[in-house]
Amino acid sequence: GGPGQFNYFQQIDVNEDTGLIFMLTTSGKINVYEMETGKFLYDIKIPDKETAQFAMLNDTLVATFMLNSSGQQKERIYISSQKENILNTFYRSDLFEVKSGTRWLMMSGIDRYMFRYKDLICYKEFYNDTLFVVTEKELQPRYIFDLGKYSIPIDCRMEACDGDWKTYNTIAAPYIRNQVIETDSLLFMPYNYWAGEKQRERHMVLYDKKAKECFSVPGGYIKNDFPGALPLRPATSLDRNTLVSVWEVGDIMKEAEKNPEVLEHPQLKKLTEDDNPVLMVVYMK
């Protein structure tokens, strides 16, 4: 116990087979808890780096991901053991120079760089066209997403613009950033434009893994056939066929203006404007 356990948690990972919860803290450690009781068990030290996200390869082996906010962060993923020993390092080649030396980074709270599908640890950067599977020995390419003319060049990134928002908002406007959420039958790919007037627009593409076909979802949300139900735009997956959509209360109220039946749902009837975001869990057939 002790004050050292109480930190800001950046991310969590779960091993349902062993009943353990792993929480990345701002103190350079991963706290490990028992799922059933919430009891603190032990902590795992990670490399003394600016870790953005992590995933557990097993209960003692950690993959930690570093953002390239400086332009010169050569290491992108460390594989380390419980004793902080670095066992392997995966590097990046898309380096650039920021003249002022100031760090700039475009990211949001829903960005996912490392995530799970079945027993695989998957990794994808928004600046990278490849989704990799992370193992102790290598990064294995799993999917390549050809954005073509919509792939943002290095010199159009916010980091490379050295904080010049006006320039960035113009030169980055034609390019898109996409997430990837994998289920057994589909790849969900929500995307939006990096900057400009279309930045707030929401788009989504689905890829049918069996038919090997890709198709666009009008309006960026999947229509919900249940009366008064909210449409679906997944933010993440819980397992191979369970999706989670996150709704801010303000967005639900706007949706209710178009469809008042939304607030007739038993769990939304008492919703107020200062409530926390609403999580919608969707189970795929």
Task: Give residue ranges: language-model regions.
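A short beta-strand motif characteristic of beta-propeller blades
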Residues: 1-4, 39-45, 87-90, 96-103, ...
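Short beta-strand elements that form the blades of beta-propeller/WD-repeat-like
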Residues: 19-25, 59-71, 78, 112-133, ...
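Short loop/turn segments that connect beta-strands within beta-propeller blades
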Residues: 34-38, 80-84, 134-138, 208-211, ...
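Conserved blade-ending motifs and adjacent loop-strand segments that build the rim/top face
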Residues: 142-171, 209-240, 253
